[in-house]
Amino acid sequence: MTDEFTAPAYGDRSLGDVLPAVAAAMGVDAGLGPTSIELPEGRRYVVFLVDGLGYELLRDHPEEAPFLHSLLGAQAPATVGVPSTTATSLTSLGTALPPGTHGVVGYTSRIPGSDRLLNALLWDAGVDAREWQSHPTAFGRMAAAGVHTTVVNKRAFATSGLTVAGQRGAEFVGADRVGERLAAALEASTGSPSLTYLYDGDLDWTGHAYGVASMQWEQQLSMIDMAAEHLRETLPSDVRVVVVADHGMVDSPFDQRVDVDEVPDLQDGVALVGGEARFRHLYCRSGAVDDVVASWRSVLGTRAEVLSRDEALALGWFGEVSPVVRPRYGDVVVACRGDFAVQSLSAFPHEAKLLGLHGSLTSAEMLVPILVA
């Protein structure tokens, strides 16, 4: 693993190992495989995923999140996969598979055989989510093993491609407000055995908009902390609650960024730019991979790790990569260090408005808490 980067712990202590650990704690054989994550025995579990709640961010904010911070010591952090981004992480959680197997390889990635990108959050390219991610989900496997599985999320996500890719097989319950979410969790947990998944995206949104060093982010963290404590108080004591996250976040000042559109050497040989600002997929013109690697390394220097696809695969960044998934990855991938970012504002104009970013392999982005309440 390159300097300053955190290796993903696939099959050991990664986000994709959480549901296998839950199944083991329930005593349910869902065929999800072993994991080193150990959770307390229980027949009813609620998994609460807080988007953007990195381990280091929580560690550094004990006053803003006293309840969640008090739970930090019981479990070592887990890693997410690469890239450290929501679409990839949620699918790893939901399938118990690494990105190279489940195939949701980033925020945006090329649809093989085309010059188009799939936005995995919006699922906007007419791609069948069941074909793009064809493996059974962990939710579905647990349901088949007799566990009442429920996903509680905003109503708008009920039939989204990302929900279908990573969470099909569970009953979906729409809940747009915190109170609805709590009520849904309580109702879903009445059966035994049961697994209920809750999602909250407000902390991530706030971090993108204002940065993780902002008062707004700290206030939102406090609200999440109160919501988690209320969830624990509302549920019966024999219902286990596990709080996890899909990635951390770093603030990237706008003067610490490079725009591909403004540097001709970064455009030569590149047919399509995908990924996101902290982790880019570069899809190259025929025969241009070596030249693109050399040019990007020359321009970016130590600010980013620039690797060919084969080099990144050899490092194990994506876990086991299936032949059908392989061409979805960039011919070249670019992982940023420190607070650096690579924008492409012609293709991704919204990046000019995002102060907090994630996607790379720094510990601030890769490490997430496993909190048992």
Where are each of the predicted segments found?
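Feature captures the catalytic ectodomains and active-site-proximal regions of enzymes
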Residues: 1-373
